[in-house]
């Protein structure tokens, strides 16, 4: 259990003492989602997570998966070598029994032209990135045998759910198949400098005008009524992923490679940013409530 505490406290301390620099949603974004979820856990779920994590919060472990990138998580074929083709055709099989103990938990979700999330990581025989599929499997495992699991594997499952639910609500972690497979990696101009849309959503949108800690950020976004939260948390993980993709599309399609982002980009995207963070938090809480209630 010391390993869990040390990893999580390190991530949490970095958030409290410093500012977000980069990485999926950024540590600030992930911990914001975790904090919103912590606030909306049922008493039973809160008690179970408190026991299993030795009192460490979801906000604190929200970026632990990034500490094990390449071991816990792996996105395959994210950028196709042939820009004319969909990336799913380039990876058909992969052997995960490697010395590094790599697990195929993807940071991204893949949806079709109707924003429907695939309930699999295999599309017509080809691997696709699908964090929702892995969250579904991890949640089922925890619900079935959380008490029987190895301590570290249980922590890993909880931490992965927290992180992957966060990732699937980030617009640049959504693959729109087949029309927009690599948009997040498009280079754009922001304040006279070249950056990527992915980098904007992984941190720059938070730090452009804000100097918040994750607690402050969570309070900014956690504004839905109980009725709205019930609506947001309807359905299952695939419904959540589809809704996330639908809500994110305006942000994804607004600008492309070579575009100069306007000075108003941060405020233009703020409604999407805030709604995705709050929805991710509410849904993360709903997943754990369903597992442990």
Language model regions located:
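Positively charged n-region of N-terminal signal peptides that target proteins for export
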Residues: 1-4, 19
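N-terminal, motif-rich segments that launch catalysis or mediate targeting to/interaction with membranes
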Residues: 23-164, 171-293
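C-terminal segment of classical bacterial N-terminal signal peptides
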Residues: 14-21
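Sec-dependent N-terminal signal peptides
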Residues: 4-13
């Amino acid at each position: 259990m010391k390993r869990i505490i040390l990893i999580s406290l390190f991530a949490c301390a970095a958030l409290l003492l410093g500012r977000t620099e980069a990485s999926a949603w950024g540590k600030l974004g992930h911990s914001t989602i975790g904090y919103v979820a912590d606030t909306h856990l049922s008493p039973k779920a809160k008690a179970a997570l408190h026991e299993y994590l030795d009192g460490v919060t979801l906000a604190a472990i929200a970026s632990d998966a990034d500490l094990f990138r390449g071991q816990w998580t792996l996105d395959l074929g994210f950028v196709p070598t042939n820009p004319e083709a969909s990336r799913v055709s380039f990876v058909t099989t992969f052997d995960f029994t490697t010395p590094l103990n790599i697990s195929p938990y993807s940071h991204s979700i893949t949806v079709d032209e109707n924003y429907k999330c695939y309930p699999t990581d295999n599309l017509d025989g080809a691997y696709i990135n699908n964090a929702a599929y892995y969250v579904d499997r991890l949640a089922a495992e925890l619900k079935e045998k959380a008490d029987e699991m190895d301590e570290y594997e249980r922590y890993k499952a909880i931490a992965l759910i927290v992180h992957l639910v966060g990732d699937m609500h980030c617009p640049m972690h959504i693959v729109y198949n087949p029309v927009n497979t690599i948009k997040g990696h498009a280079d754009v101009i922001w304040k006279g400098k070249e950056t990527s849309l992915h980098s904007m959503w992984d941190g720059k949108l938070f730090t452009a005008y804000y100097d918040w800690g994750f607690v402050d950020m969570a309070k900014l976004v956690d504004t839905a009524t109980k009725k709205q939260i019930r609506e947001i948390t309807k359905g299952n993980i695939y419904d959540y992923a589809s809704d996330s993709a639908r809500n994110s599309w305006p942000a994804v399609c607004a600008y492309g490679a070579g575009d100069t982002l306007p000075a108003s980009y941060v405020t233009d995207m703020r409604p999407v940013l805030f709604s995705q963070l709050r929805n991710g938090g509410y849904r993360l809480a709903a997943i754990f409530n369903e597992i442990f209630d």
